[in-house]
Amino acid sequence: MASSKNNTAKHVAIIMDGNGRWAIKNTLKISEGHKKGVSIVKDIVEESIRQKISSLTIYAFSYENWKRPKAEVTAIKKLVIDAINDQVPELKDQKVRLKFFGHTNKFGKKVVDKLRYAQNETHAKNSKLDLNVALGYGGKQDFVDIVKKISKNVVEKKIELKDIGENIIHDASSVPVKEIDLLIRTGGDKRISNFLLYQIAYSEIMFIDKYWPDFSKKDFLKCLEDFKKINRRFGKRNND
């Protein structure tokens, strides 16, 4: 199928899976796998800017990840703080706008304060890339929150039932982006793991066998090039 110049991915999401398995494979601590994963994010952010992608949404920590061993969760909390301290100055220079979403309050005041700092520091109006980071996020949990918010607004007569549509749902969601063009999952598993259930309704989905720490700019570019070759019909026929 011929590539279309207009068929470019502007809104990309990534399930960054495989940090732990990569660490075990290389006889390293799990925390070392997560650290390596952060360095890959930096590479993909740089390439996203170069490719003029509007938003990059990454699954850093799921709602279900709270079930992981306490030591691993503690290490991830520290990694979040360290990554912000290390990367925010560069992201600011790159005009990358950071946004965090999900049940972030569960991370505690120290982490939440650092997230707020990072968002404030990178809040550029003329941003080259929106980097949306899911922390403590789950798609089903987001649906529950949306229903509660909208129901409350209806009860308080702030909106009427007839007003409820896609825009109202988006406004009630914690997810900053409306629709995802391309979803990439590394690590070999072929599932979406409760990520952006509403926003990926018409996303193209690519499953990559490589673990996230082995994912490269070259791999990312191949995904973007493969996306260009896809005939996206959105339920229509080619001649519609």
Predicted features and spans:
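Flexible, compositionally biased loop and terminal segments
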Residues: M1-D240
